[in-house]
Structure formats: C-alpha cells, structure tokens
C-alpha cells in the first residue's frame, strides 16, 4: 500500500501482530497549520483552539511539528508518540482539540487553526506555501511509503512496483503536478 509512513506502519504492526515493512519511500506530505481567520502564527490569539489528529502517531507528529516551530514545548524525552498531556510549555495557552483525521478539514471552519496534511487542505483550496501559518520540514520517517508484508517485500512483483514508482518519469510527474502535496521522497 501507499498510505502510511513508517511510524504509523510500526504502530499498526505492534497493535495487529503484523509484519509490514517499508519497501520504498515514495513522497513527503508535510503537515501544515491552517487557519480560516488568521494569516500568521503571530495573529493566532492566546487561548486559541488548535485541532490536531487524535490517533497516536499523527497526534505525536503534530505536537512534534508545533514544538519544532516554537509553538509549544514537550517534556524532555517525549518522542514521537507524545500526547497533549506531554506539553510542558504552552506560552499562549492554546487549547488542543483532538479529532479524527477525517474531521480536520471540517475543523478549519470550527477551530481557530487546524493541523492538516495537504491531502485534507487541497479540497479546501488551500496550499502550504500560500495558506499555511506553518509548514513542517520533510522528515524521512514520515514519507508516505510503499509498504508490503515482510514475506513478500522482496518478491519480483513488489520490486518491479518499487522500481516503477521511483522512476524519473514519476518523479517529474509528482514535481510538476503535486509540488506542494507530494514531493518525491526518493532520488
């Protein structure tokens, strides 16, 4: 499949006694912080509500992203599976509303800001470079990847698929058609 990053895959493996493995990183989908009302992070008022994903890996990722941008500080050693309870410093007393990933786009209307992937922002006609208050830097562990069962990851069919999706033609297609939502994660 192509819909998960390696940390989400590992959480799936742990929770389902599964053995999925990353075959090939495919593209980066960086989180962004979007607001319907505010145009910069400095405009986001004290006590504003920020919608974040409620599943463990994406919540942790969203909080790590906000920490990297200086919005909050997490307890030392929190790691990627942080929760709202791990927030140590929150200078503007933001409130964090945890919602299902599929609700984040709707929260664009209801919350002061929403942490979303480009795939959720695009249907709202939002792009990271023009509309996001903040955009996550690409992180290899979060690249959407071709994933397979461990027992067939090296099969000829899977390897042909990996080769096809990382071709120069696919790279060019992604760069030309999805520059802000699917930057190639392969060379």
Feature-to-residue mapping (PLM):
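A conserved helix-loop-strand patch within extracytoplasmic ligand-binding domains
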Residues: 19-72, 171
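Periplasmic-binding protein-like
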Residues: 25-35, 60-67, 122-163, 165-187
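Ligand-binding "clamshell"
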Residues: 11-23, 38, 110, 115, ...
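Stable alpha-helical elements in mature extracytoplasmic
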Residues: 4, 58-62, 154-157, 161, ...
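Beta->alpha turn/N-cap motifs
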Residues: 1-10, 100-101, 109-111, 116-122
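Ligand-binding cleft/hinge of the Venus flytrap
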Residues: 61-97
């Amino acid at each position: 499949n192509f819909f998960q990053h390696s940390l989400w895959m590992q959480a799936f493996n742990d929770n389902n006694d599964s053995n999925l493995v990353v075959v090939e990183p495919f593209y980066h989908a960086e989180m962004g912080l979007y607001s319907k009302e505010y145009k910069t992070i400095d405009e986001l008022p004290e006590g504003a509500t920020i919608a974040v994903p409620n599943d463990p890996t994406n919540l942790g990722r969203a909080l790590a992203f906000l920490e990297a941008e200086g919005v909050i500080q997490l307890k030392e050693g929190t790691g990627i599976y942080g929760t709202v309870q791990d927030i140590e410093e929150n200078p503007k007393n933001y409130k964090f509303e945890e919602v299902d990933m599929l609700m984040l786009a709707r929260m664009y209307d209801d919350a002061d800001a929403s942490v979303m992937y480009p795939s959720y922002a695009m249907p709202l006609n939002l792009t990271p470079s023009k509309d996001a208050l903040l955009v996550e830097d690409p992180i290899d562990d979060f690249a959407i990847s071709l994933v397979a069962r461990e027992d067939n990851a090296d099969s000829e069919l899977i390897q042909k698929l990996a080769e096809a999706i990382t071709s120069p033609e696919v790279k060019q297609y992604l760069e030309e058609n999805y520059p802000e939502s699917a930057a190639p994660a392969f060379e």
